[in-house]
Amino acid sequence: MAYLHFSEDELAGRRQRACEKMAAQGLDAVLLFKQESMFYLTGYDTGGYSLFQCLIMRADGDLVLVTRSADKLQAAHTSMIPDVRIWIDKGGANPAHDVVAVLKEKGLAGKQVGVELHAWCLTGQRWDMVRNALDGFCSHSDATDLIQGLRLIKSPAEMEYVR
C-alpha cells in the first residue's frame, strides 16, 4: 500500500486538470521528467531526481513510469502509478528507447507529445537521446510549463496541508 501525502481524489483532480490543459494545447501525451511534477500528479517521491526517469501521461490520464530498478520499490510505496517499467542502468544504456517502446505500445506513433525539457535529470546528453528516439516517431514540443502552471494554484487540500 502506498503512503500518499494527498488523497487519491486530490491526485485524480490534478491529473484531470493536466489532461484538460493537454487537450487545450493539442497534446496526445506528455513526457514528465521533473520530480515535482511526478509528485504533484501521483505522489511519487524519490531522491533519484537527478537520474533518468520519465512519467508518461496520455491525454486520457493513462500513466506509465519508466525508471531504474533502484526506484521501483519507492514508486510502489509513495505513488499510485499503476504501471512501472524498468530500464536497465548499465554502460551504453539508452532509456529513451524504453520510453519510445511505451509510447509505441500506447498508440502514440505520429502523435503530438509534449516534453518537460527543464528538469534536473534531462541533461543535454539525455535530451539528445530522447530527441533522437522521438524524431521520426512522433511530433514533440516543449511542455515544461504544463504542470508547473497548474501547481501555482493551490487546492483546499494543499492549503490545509501547509497550515
What do the predicted segments below correspond to?
Residues 60, 64-98:
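Compact, glycine/acidic-enriched structural inserts
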Residues 46-48, 81-82, 129-132:
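Short, solvent-exposed amphipathic alpha-helical segments in soluble enzyme
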Residues 4-6, 86, 117, 146:
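Short, contiguous strand/loop micro-motifs
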Residues 1-62:
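Terminal domain-start leader segments
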Residues 93-163:
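Flexible, acidic/His-enriched mid-domain "rim/lid" segments that flank
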Residues 28, 82, 111:
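Conserved acidic residues
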Residues 33-35, 68-69, 115-119:
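Structural motif
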